[in-house]
């Protein structure tokens, strides 16, 4: 694959790349690029994790990058996920969550057999070098910066937290260096951790990143967008200048199950949730359905077909998102027709995951999770 083609795949559907020129240089030099993305184990997998993240993993694989999934069981424990029960977190991590991410990659056309999974607790066990890295990173980072960085856990800056939460950011940064990851990947909400990694990289004596010329380097970082939840915002209308500050609050969240879609939702559930979604006619600045079309449907399918009766103008076929957005803004596409078409597209995309969790071990793992969440 040509250098520009590899870079185009890496940059596709991303918010930003930290160290973009460094990345281009690495590709041109034939440097081995090691990717990872880490996940807290916090319940069912929704489209933000299953499709948004894994579609980028598929792009990276197509670009010839070594891809790794980090199952962050200790981080989940620190952040009180699944009731803060470490045994349950580990059980779900190596069971349901791993199965769900493999199925998600299949949904976007990737090969799950090429994925490497790492469980945090196994990486840390009897690993003095890792803990030396945590300490060294902490020594090079101020307390105030660590406190500001707890937003990577979905916590508000300035809130009261137990001390363990302050260990989370340096652990996340240390995960990068101990695994020799030169291209960490995450949603844009994890940016603060990646910036710390770049800021401390040249100061490290334990677990430094070294390129194929023997030079100490900084990790690059690829950040993708967070997709919106389907609900109506608490404040409407939203002024354009306010929207950017509110996006992290409006992102898809499994704590609001009616405003998100899980990878194994039934066809009926997918249609029900999308039919209820906030989608104002001609509104393009804040529109979750359009956001999903832009971030999920087009990157995965490359097109969207709008099916509607002849009396309402007949079927339409779009090969680019800007054209669809333009027509929606003019009122040429009705929200109901857009919703129906998006539901149909997602049902087809999610079929491999839906089928995967209908039987066998995967079905048992999902049932275990459901029972665990009820009794928690």
Name the predicted role of every residue range.
Residues 244-319:
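Internal helical hairpin/lid segments
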